[in-house]
UniProtKB/Swiss-Prot annotation:
SMART domains: SR. Residues 1-45 form the signal peptide. The keyword Secreted applies. Pfam families: SRCR. Disulfide bonds join 76-141, 89-151, 120-130, 184-248, 197-258, 228-238, 291-355, 304-365, 335-345, 398-462, 411-472, 442-452, 503-567, 516-577, 547-557, 608-672, 621-682, 652-662, 744-808, 757-818, 788-798, 864-925, 895-905, 954-1018, 967-1028, 998-1008. The chain crosses the membrane at residues 1047-1067. The gene is CD163. One of its GO terms (biological process) is acute-phase response. This is Scavenger receptor cysteine-rich type 1 protein M130. PROSITE patterns: SRCR_1, SRCR_2. Its main location: membrane. It is found in: Cell membrane. GO terms for cellular component: extracellular region; plasma membrane. Residues 46-1046 are extracellular.
Length: 1151
């Protein structure tokens, strides 16, 4: 950390300056000299740097010197490497690094030693981009250790191929320092050969060889153990040990054959068409064949493409044509499919094989004009039997080797979406011999069926007598919208590009079962009518789904048309699915005991027991018709299981009918300890239900029930937190004797709150609130004077006055805030927008950021919807703002499609750590207001995002003041006109606002008086609109380049410093003239004060002269309470959460 030291000097070079400095205050002198130091440091950073080589034999060799601050200096050779030499050589236009030396060939340098311990990767653009100790810092180096280099611009280097019959094949030889030498074959491969061929302009590399295949050379062996990536411009630019360093002899000389020296060509012989037949290759003037060992569709695809017949129909082994003769040039060809020529695929050395000519390879290709694919007999072009027509022959696809991946490829090729169903049609044995297409397999990503590998075509026999049939989605898909948990919400179906809702009278239990199964959400739990999940907007489909319940997709259900206008959005149907496809107990002695396993996305996995409790177990036993939960054995009581261990945390109360009804969280879930999987032992009595326990046992004297066991009854005392904005914060309420009631705050403290939080699975208590912090409750006040020791498993096990014994009122209702309470916000020092900034999560009593690893647009959409900030957004680059003192809580958040809150998304476990702004997530959600159907972005129909959907504004009372607020909010110029009566067309969805009465100076439309959200008697023919000037009212500063910015800053700083100094000097001069007497003795006793900057410019909290020496340094630790600041709160999902955070700050501030 930078410090200032005050030094008293006995002498000074200028009496006049000394005399005036004496009269300046210490603070003024400190500021002036501090600014001066900053000016000098800034100037150093902006100084132009230069590099040169001195005292060498030519411009590409010599001692390395760097110029900075107009002063030349040297570089110490500590850690000097060939990587650093490569950087210097490239920087100076001498691209070939020859040698790294401590320059002893000439006189030592002089002046500064600017750099030491230089460490380069080799790809830096300048030497000063490499790591080093710092400018002017070195470890006692002298100029005897000055670093030097020897480079080459290539003009003195040559390469040739010899003894190969032409200039593009043969033994590699390099001329260096006037002498020809060879290259050792150690680690020599096709990448090296590619560099050689490219450098000699001989085309691509066909083959390489070692062991002096082109004869032994003579002279030096210049290179050994070369490392090339294939992109180098010259062989000597590959990494190497150094010129002339090797452990080889000339029996290991390397050679290459390039395409221009191989006389290569490919042809088809003896085929029925121009694109079929036996393959032959010409190599070094002679034709030969290819052996069929390993010959497959990838190899055929390369050959066909090379021959100008781009689609490979069949890869033929033991080709049905007259046998070839002559050489067998290639064997064991293995192509990836993207190579430009067959000989560029992997293969044995040219001419080496283990074949004879009855194994010659061939192909049947097509130019695509004679290939056709279609679906017939299914009622539309996107359903039916798969038919293919190849070279004018019509055939079917045999279902042998046929599956959903292959069907997906067909649907995609035909523009019919994805495959919903694949089946087969049985034919008689007589019809089985036909033209058939056989597929080995598709990976599902191909753009057409012809791209799938190893397919065969012809008059073959389909052993199964079955032809493939497909039903495609045709871009028709369902979804659930607006639910609080995944797999629940309003039913919407997409036809083409349009989403629409479904009337509750048109959706049966069978249809809901199909929907849940299609969405991989398990089984249907309930069907809810009356727009339970909110009203949709847009289309209401006038069709009844007549499913039987066994269909795999909703699109496969028959539909019956309904008359239009018979339904409204107030009757939109909703569905709740179980989310989990299946849930089961395994490895137990009976079906009603065992390890808990969930099936999600067709994969079974065990459930972690870190949050598994008896309430969760009760619900599972009931769902499986196994009575009630008797115990939840810990550890791997029924075995560890295989596959994934699900970290999802259920939060059941014990009264739910299905596990899908319980809230679930996944964000920040810890990795499951080895072997810690959930288990349960149910009573097994399928007719048994949970009866009410004797309420007399629920008093303070009730014995503690171990968490791993429970009585087979529902305790009358259920517990919940109300009005806190989440399940882990709020007013404490207990269900007792048929009524919900509260707890009085007398003696209410953290020990009591700990029991509540632990009982609810919400971690530990952060705050125990009183005075009806979360609002006054109703009904009985059940408990008073709670005195928990903090270890009880239920709040009613604590000592108290007894049930209903109290002298309180509801203004004394107790509440809690637990560590598992979570909230979300976007915050930025540079923006007041609540919908833009750094993504932060409130957890364990503190705000922390969210990492940007694997952050996707889907996850951003979940965040923006959760915050009520439109339905999507974008990820921004790291903010340039100063990073605030805040840790990172969680990283690797990966939301799938479906969750409505970030809490339901998997992530890395909670871990508090420091993070740079570049590691954090910065988001800007789309504007919650937009203008639609206008000629420009600043005119059109006004639409607002609210409650999870877009809606319009009614034109009642709509005027220019309202329009002015809209224009300002959208960043447009002043309002020109406020339109009524759907000037830009009628919108869809809700009419969110009516009777808007702005003054014109509000910052947003929702700050204006209006009727309650969604309360309107208007129709869309009254949609309001605006026309704004298309001139932005937001000032966007012009961005200067880095160099311009630094120069401008330095110039301004210099002018300011000069002005300050002149003003101070004149002021002090005037004061001196006004003095009546001056004691020369006193003046001589005055000492000068000089402030020296010891390291770098000061931070404000480092000025010892301006701060009391008694101030203590702040701890670097992040105390949870210290991280909560009222001044930085933003609204978070409602007033309740804001109240929680405000109270937490107040409580922690009093500690």
């Amino acid at each position: 950390m930078s410090k200032l030291r005050m030094v008293l000097l006995e002498d000074s070079g200028s009496a006049d300056v000394r005399r005036h400095f004496v009269n300046l205050s210490p603070f003024t002198i400190a500021v002036v000299l501090l600014l001066r130091a900053c000016f000098v440091t800034s100037s150093l950073g902006g100084t132009t740097k230069e590099l040169r080589l001195v005292d060498g034999e030519n411009k590409c060799s010599g001692r390395v010197e760097v110029k900075i601050q107009e002063e030349w200096g040297t570089v110490c050779n500590n850690g000097w490497s060939m990587e650093a030499v490569s950087v210097i050589c490239n920087q100076l236009g001498c691209p070939t690094a020859i040698k790294a030396t401590g320059w002893a060939n000439s006189s030592a340098g002089s002046g500064r030693i600017w750099m030491d311990h230089v460490s380069c990767r080799g790809n830096e653009s300048a030497l000063w981009d490499c790591k080093h100790d710092g400018w002017g810092k070195h470890s006692n180096c002298t100029h005897q250790q000055d670093a030097g280099v020897t480079c080459s611009d290539g003009s003195d280097l040559e390469m040739r191929l010899t003894n190969g019959g032409n200039m593009c094949s043969g033994r590699i030889e390099i001329k260096f320092q006037g002498q020809w030498g060879t290259v050792c074959d150690d680690n020599f491969n096709i990448n090296h050969a590619s560099v050689v061929c490219k450098q000699l302009e001989c085309g691509s590399a066909v083959s390489f060889s070692g062991s002096a295949n082109f004869g032994e050379g003579s002279g030096p062996i210049w290179f050994d153990d070369l490392i090339c990536n294939g992109n180098e411009s010259a062989l000597w630019n590959c990494k190497h040990q150094g010129w002339g360093k090797h452990n080889c002899d000339h029996a290991e000389d390397a050679g290459v054959i390039c395409s221009k020296g191989a006389d290569l060509s490919l042809r088809l012989v003896d085929g029925v068409t121009e694109c079929s037949g036996r393959l032959e290759v010409r190599f070094q003037g002679e034709w030969g064949t290819i052996c069929d060992d390993g010959w497959d569709s990838h190899d055929a695809a390369v050959a066909c493409k090379q021959l100008g017949c781009p689609t490979a129909i069949t890869a033929i082994g033991r080709v049905n044509a007259s046998e070839g003769f002559g050489h067998i040039w290639l064997d064991s060809v293995s192509c990836q499919g993207h190579e430009p020529a067959v000989w560029q695929c992997k293969h044995h050395e040219w001419g080496k094989h283990y074949c004879n000519h009855n194994e010659d390879a061939g192909v049947t290709c097509s130019d695509g004009s004679d290939l056709e694919l279609r679906l017939r007999g299914g009622g539309s072009r996107c359903a039916g039997t798969v038919e293919v027509e190849i070279q004018r022959l019509l055939g079917k696809v045999c279902d042998r080797g046929w599956g959903l991946k292959e069907a997906d490829v067909v649907c995609r090729q035909l523009g019919c979406g994805s495959a919903l169903k694949t089946s087969y049609q049985v034919y008689s044995k007589i019809q089985a011999t036909n033209m058939w297409l056989f597929l080995s397999s598709c990976n599902g990503n191909e753009t057409s069926l012809w791209d799938c590998k190893n397919w065969q075509w012809g008059g073959l026999t389909c052993d199964h007598y079955e032809e493939a049939k497909i039903t495609c989605s045709a871009h028709r898909e369902p979804r659930l919208v607006g639910g609080d948990i995944p797999c629940s919400g309003r039913v919407e179906v997409k036809h083409g590009d349009t989403w629409g809702s479904v009337c509750d009278s048109d959706f049966s239990l069978e249809a809901a079962s199909v929907l849940c199964r299609e969405l991989q959400c398990g089984t249907v739990v309930s069907i809810l009518g009356g727009a339970h999940f909110g009203e949709g907007n847009g289309q209401i489909w006038t069709e009844e789904f007549q499913c039987e319940g066994h269909e795999s997709h909703l699109s496969l259900c028959p539909v019956a048309p309904r008359p239009e206008g018979t339904c409204s959005h107030s009757r939109d149907v909703g569905v709740v699915c179980s989310r989990y496809t299946e849930i089961r107990l395994v490895n137990g002695k009976t079906p009603c005991e065992g390890r808990v396993e969930l099936k999600t996305l067709n994969a079974w996995g065990s459930l972690c027991n870190s949050h598994w409790d008896i309430e969760d177990a009760h619900v599972l036993c009931q769902q499986l018709k196994c009575g009630v939960a008797l115990s939840t054995p810990g550890g791997a009581h029924f075995g560890k299981g295989n596959g994934q261990v699900w970290r999802h945390m259920f939060h059941c109360t014990g009264t739910e009918q299905h596990m899908g009804d319980c809230p679930v969280t996944a964000l920040g879930a810890s990795l499951c300890p080895s072997g810690q999987v959930a288990s349960v032992i149910c009573s097994g009595n399928q007719s048994q239900t949970l009866s009410s326990c004797n309420s007399s046992s629920l008093g303070p004297t009730r014995p503690t029930i171990p968490e791993e066991s429970a009585v087979a009854c529902i305790e009358s005392g259920q517990l919940r937190l109300v009005n806190g904005g989440g399940r882990c914060a709020g007013r404490v309420e207990i269900y007792h004797e048929g009524s919900w009631g509260t707890i009085c705050d007398d003696s209410w403290d953290l020990s009591d709150a700990h029991v509540v939080c632990r009982q609810l699975g919400c971690g530990e208590a952060i705050n125990a609130t009183g005075s009806a912090h979360f609002g006054e409750g109703t009904g009985p006040i059940w408990l008073d004077e709670m005195k928990c020791n903090g270890k009880e498993s239920r709040i009613w096990q604590c000592h108290s006055h007894g049930w209903g014994q109290q002298n309180c009122r509801h203004k004394e209702d107790a509440g809690v805030i637990c560590s598992e309470f979570m909230s979300l916000r976007l915050t930025s020092e540079a923006s007041r927008e609540a919908c833009a900034g750094r993504l932060e999560v409130f957890y364990n009593g503190a705000w922390g950021s969210v990492g940007r690893s694997n952050m996707s647009e889907t996850t951003v959409g979940v965040v923006c919807r959760q915050l009520g900030c439109a339905d999507k957004g974008k990820i921004n680059s790291a903010s340039l703002d100063k990073a605030m003192s805040i840790p990172m809580w969680v990283d690797n958040v990966q939301c799938p499609k479906g969750p409505d809150t970030l809490w339901q998304c998997p992530s890395s476990p909670w871990e508090k750590r420091l993070a740079r702004p570049s590691e954090e997530t910065w988001i800007t959600c789309d504007n919650k207001m937009r203008l639609q159907e206008g000629p420009t972005s600043c005119s059109g129909r006004v639409e607002i995002w609210h409650g999870g959907s877009w809606g319009t504004v009614c034109d009642d009372s709509w005027d220019l003041n309202d329009a002015q607020v809209v224009c300002q909010q959208l960043g447009c110029g002043p309002a020109l006109k406020a339109f009524k009566e759907a000037e830009f067309g009628q919108g869809t969805g809700p009419i969110w606002l009516n009777e808007v009465k702005c003054k014109g100076n509000e910052s947003s439309l929702w700050d204006c008086p209006a009727r309650r959200w969604g309360h309107s008697e208007c129709g869309h023919k009254e949609d309001a609109a605006v026309n704004c000037t298309d001139i932005s009212t937001r000032k966007t500063p012009q961005k200067a380049t880095t160099g311009q910015s630094s120069l401008i800053a330095v110039g301004i700083l210099g002018v300011v410093l000069l002005a300050i100094f002149v003003a101070l000097f004149l002021t002090q001069k005037r004061r001196q003239r006004q003095r009546l007497t001056v004691s020369s003795r006193g003046e001589n006793l005055v000492h000068q004060i000089q402030y020296r900057e010891m390291n770098s410019c000061l931070n404000a909290d480092d000025l010892d002269l301006m701060n009391s020496s008694e101030n203590s340094n702040e701890s670097a630790d992040f105390n949870a309470a210290e991280l909560i600041s009222v001044s930085k709160f933003l609204p978070i999902s409602g007033m309740e959460k804001e109240a929680i955070l405000r109270h937490t700050e107040k409580e922690n501030g009093n500690l």
